[in-house]
Amino acid sequence: MKTFVLLTKLSGKNALLTDIGSKLGDRPRSGLEWLNDLRKQCPEITFKAHFALMGYWDSMHIYEAQDEECAARVSMITRQHGAKEVETWLAIPYEKIVKIAEELGPGK
């Protein structure tokens, strides 16, 4: 399984505070609907963590999936559930990067 990081933004740059407030007020229900839809359409994924963020992105979800196609489905379903922006990263464990660097050797 590969590890992916899903970043989401609920509202656009120039959203009114009332728009943001209404989305946040409805977030527990809509978040549960999103998770249930993902579990139904992508049963092979396993979520590892969910975070609310203080910055450009509103939330970060770390999950494992078999491949990039599955990650693309997660991203598309997230957009269907109202996220204004979505970005997905493939996360490689640090130990694997170290191993790759060792295999390449110095100067290669």
Question: What kind of region is each of these model predictions?
Answer:
Residues 44-50, 86-87:
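A short linear hydrophobic-aromatic micro-motif
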Residues 5-9, 48-74:
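Short, well-ordered beta-strand segments in beta-rich or mixed alpha/beta enzyme
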Residues 45, 55, 81:
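Structured loop/turn residues at beta-strand edges in well-structured enzyme cores
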Residues 1-44, 57, 95-108:
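Short S/T/G/P-rich N-terminal loop/turn motif that feeds into the first structured element of a domain
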